[in-house]
Amino acid sequence: MAGQKIRIRLKAYDHEAIDASAKKIVETVTRTGARVVGPVPLPTEKNVYAVIRSPHKYKDSREHFEMRTHKRLIDILDPTPKTVDALMRIDLPASVDVNIQ
């Protein structure tokens, strides 16, 4: 697998969970002998929702809620079969979305 690259994108609402998952991936990959670039923090996506406070009146009074999606990027250079096997066995929280390319 020389000259190849594995790109891992992580997404989560909780920044602590995504940082812990990224650290776990980096430690696992470095133990197998592959080179790691990252984790690179990508821009945080922020969705703001405005909801009317009253059930039927006072449209000017609104409450704002936001959801932040934190993203990280990890590149694995020159992965070995041992690296790929270790990545398949790694256990990450359900709140972290993992996309491997």
Curated annotation (Swiss-Prot):
Gene3D superfamilies referenced in this protein's UniProt entry, alphabetically: Ribosomal protein S10 domain
SMART domains: Ribosomal_S10
Keyword Ribosomal protein: yes
Keywords of this entry: Ribonucleoprotein, Ribosomal protein
Keyword Ribosomal protein among record annotations: yes
InterPro entries, per database record: Ribosomal_uS10, Ribosomal_uS10_CS, Ribosomal_uS10_dom, Ribosomal_uS10_dom_sf
An example molecular function term from Gene Ontology annotations: tRNA binding
PROSITE patterns in alphabetical order: RIBOSOMAL_S10
GO biological process, any: translation
Record-level GO cellular component terms: ribonucleoprotein complex; ribosome
Primary role: Involved in the binding of tRNA to the ribosomes.
UniProt family annotation: Belongs to the universal ribosomal protein uS10 family.
Oligomer status and interactors: Part of the 30S ribosomal subunit.
Protein name as catalogued: Small ribosomal subunit protein uS10
Species in which this protein is naturally found: Corynebacterium aurimucosum (strain ATCC 700975 / DSM 44827 / CIP 107346 / CN-1)
Highest classification ranks of the organism: Bacteria, Bacillati, Actinomycetota, Actinomycetes, Mycobacteriales
